[in-house]
């Protein structure tokens, strides 16, 4: 029970942090991970990527593909209006 509660709280905190990061400017998943790590949050790709997908499926995020000179195309995330509204509500 306690471990499930901790897991849910952590996901909620990460979701808030991701919304805040993307609100500043569109972001590539790797940049999001770096920003979270700079804030001393212990995160791994295996947590962030599924969370980004879930948030996109919930209508909080959208993305666009951009060609990369050093590899495959990159997916850049932005907040949707719904994502901006949620972040505003969370900040109140």
Tell where the protein language model's regions lie, with residue ranges.
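Glycine-centered, phosphate/nucleic-acid-interacting loop/turn motifs that mediate DNA/RNA or nucleotide
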Residues: 59
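Basic amphipathic alpha-helical segments that dock to polyanions
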Residues: 48-50, 54-55
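Short secondary-structure boundary/capping segments
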Residues: 53, 68-69
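N-terminal helix-turn-helix DNA-binding core of bacterial DNA-binding proteins
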Residues: 6-47, 66
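C-terminal regulatory/oligomerization modules of transcriptional regulators
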Residues: 1-9, 62, 89-92
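Short amphipathic alpha-helical/adjacent loop interface patches that line ligand
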Residues: 26, 36, 52, 83, ...
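Basic, amphipathic "hinge/linker" alpha-helix immediately C-terminal to the N-terminal HTH DNA-binding motif
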Residues: 69, 73-91
């Amino acid at each position: 029970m306690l471990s499930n509660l901790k897991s849910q709280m952590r996901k909620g905190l990460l979701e808030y942090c991701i919304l805040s990061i993307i609100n500043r400017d569109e972001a590539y998943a790797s940049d999001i991970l770096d920003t979270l790590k700079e804030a001393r949050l212990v995160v791994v790709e295996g947590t962030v990527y599924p969370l980004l997908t879930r948030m996109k499926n919930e209508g909080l995020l959208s993305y666009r593909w951009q060609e990369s000179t050093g590899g495959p195309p990159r997916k850049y995330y932005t907040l949707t209006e719904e994502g901006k509204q949620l972040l505003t509500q969370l900040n109140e």
